[in-house]
Structure formats: C-alpha cells, structure tokens
C-alpha cells in the first residue's frame, strides 16, 4: 500500500511539475495523467485499465457486443485537449465524428470495451490507455491533423445513438 501511495505522489509531482513544452517522456506523462485521473470523482476503472465516466446512463438493457454495429456521435482528443474540469476543449480534437456507423469489432480495444458498457442514448467519456489504443506505434503522420503520438492516452466523448 505504501508503494502505491509513493508511486502516486511521485507521478503527481512529475505531472504537476511539467509544462507541455517541457515534456520529455510522453509515455510517463500519459501514465501519470491516468493515475491522477483515476482519483477523480465519477471515474470508473476496469481491470484492463480503461477508465470511463458516465455522463448520461442511457436506457434499456441492450448493450453492443462484438457482432453489433453502432450509430454514435464522438469526439477524440489527447490529454492536452482536456481542461481542468475534465471537459474536451473545442478545436483540440484529433478526431470529430458526426453521426457515424461502425462495427464494435473494428475499433481499438479500449473504444470497443467502452462501447460494450453503454446503453442506447448513453453518453460516456472514455479514457483509453495506450495499451488499449495504438500502443507504442501512434497513428497518422507527425505534423498533420489527426496525428496521435506513440504511447498516447486517448480520450473520447461518445454518445451511443443506436445499436443494430
């Protein structure tokens, strides 16, 4: 238990002591951010490391599974696109989807896991560690819109409109 608290304090100091332009190790910074985020009110953490917050629980008993398709609204950002209240900052998204249809089994592991927890008309914020995202590979081309650096925590605001 002491080790966990020591690690938490150390990571918190690293996180709060750095400015964005001073980040030397993006992986460590993202891991520290997730440790701090997990302590916030309303954050639920799964055994895989996915964290999520229920904004609106949704209705009914039907949840998506790997064989389903979903109709969703979503926005995605990195930890640099979140304000102090945990809200996504407009204009800092790497991805903004309108009403989009996608297969649950066609997305990254953390996004699929989050979708499977939702009910129709529900709205969640998913905090996806790099292990459930793009790993150490990243996504896209550096310097272009939509680029996701390696080891990035991905944050998605997702509204589940329909399941079919």
Regions of interest found by a model, annotated:
Residues 2-6, 18-164:
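Cross-family detector of peptidyl-prolyl cis-trans isomerase
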